[in-house]
Regions:
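Catalytic Walker B motif of ABC-type/P-loop ATPase nucleotide-binding domains
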Residues: 102-105
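A short, proline-enriched helix->beta-strand linker immediately N-terminal to the Walker B motif
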Residues: 96-100
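ABC ATPase NBD coupling module
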Residues: 10-24, 48
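Short coil-to-helix segment of the ABC ATPase nucleotide-binding domain corresponding to the Q-loop/switch region
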Residues: 36-43
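ABC ATPase "signature
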Residues: 162-163, 171
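Conserved ABC ATPase signature
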Residues: 77-81, 85
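Conserved ABC ATPase "signature" region
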Residues: 47, 54-72
Length: 236
């Protein structure tokens, strides 16, 4: 038991319809309407809120561009899209009415690793651009560490520990937390929380495939091993 507050108000004191209008929701099964086009799916909530046709069309175009969906997909149906494209449409629909909070329940769990990684990067970019609060439920530890600014770890319905990812990894509250994040993988996961930009030797020059400053040290280490080298250039 406990209390959930939304914008400072206990949610049970707010009308359900008002709550729904202030939140977007994206789930693992996506839940697109199969008989509606991409554009119609994205427009679902704005239409319910009786936006003008012109405003809805502009919002569809804006979100498709934001999520990397080509304009020629606008009139296609869900069965004509890849899994990654369907998930992007699902996120676009969740964002369509510009909600204050985006709820995501295992949104990338059914996708292949490459598509999942690409969408995780997209969500990080979208979060930076829009500044919206995103509440993400996941069982993927690395996904949580990659995406979250604040983590809440639960066990049997109770909060075991919460805090930023670095604190959770380096100062676990108890042995359950320590085991959950993996004793043997702790070092590698810590690399996921630090960026290349913090360790650049700007006075040196190097040749080879360039790293990006925003990359994590974990991704950079992977490239070092794959290329069999100890030094690589960095671009911003």
């Amino acid at each position: 038991s406990g209390v959930i507050r939304f914008a400072g108000e206990e949610i049970r004191s707010l009308p359900v319809l008002e709550l729904r209008r202030r939140m977007g929701y994206a789930i693992q099964s996506i839940g697109l309407f199969p008989h509606w086009s991409v554009a119609q799916n994205i427009a679902t909530v704005p239409q319910l809120q009786k936006w003008s046709r012109a405003r809805i069309d502009d919002r569809i175009d804006e979100l498709m561009a934001l999520l990397g969906l080509e304009p020629n997909l606008r009139e296609r149906y869900p069965h004509q899209l890849s899994g990654g494209q369907q998930q992007r449409v699902g996120v676009a629909r969740a964002l369509a009415a510009d909600p204050q909070v985006l709820l995501m329940d295992e949104p990338f769990g059914a996708l292949d690793p490459v598509t999942r990684g690409a969408l995780q990067q997209e969500m990080t970019r979208i979060h930076r651009l829009l500044g919206r609060t995103i509440v993400l439920v996941t069982h993927d530890i690395d996904e949580a560490l990659r995406l979250a600014e604040h983590l809440v770890l639960m066990d049997h319905g109770e909060v075991v520990q919460q805090g930023n990812p670095l604190t959770m990894l380096t100062h676990p509250a108890n042995d359950f937390v320590r085991q959950f994040f993996g004793r043997s993988e702790l070092g590698v996961r810590l690399l996921s929380l630090r960026s290349v930009a913090d360790y650049v030797r700007r006075e040196e020059r190097a040749e080879g495939e360039a790293l990006e400053e925003r990359m994590t040290l974990r991704d950079a280490l992977s490239l070092f091993v794959a290329r069999g080298c100890e030094v690589l250039p960095v671009v911003n």
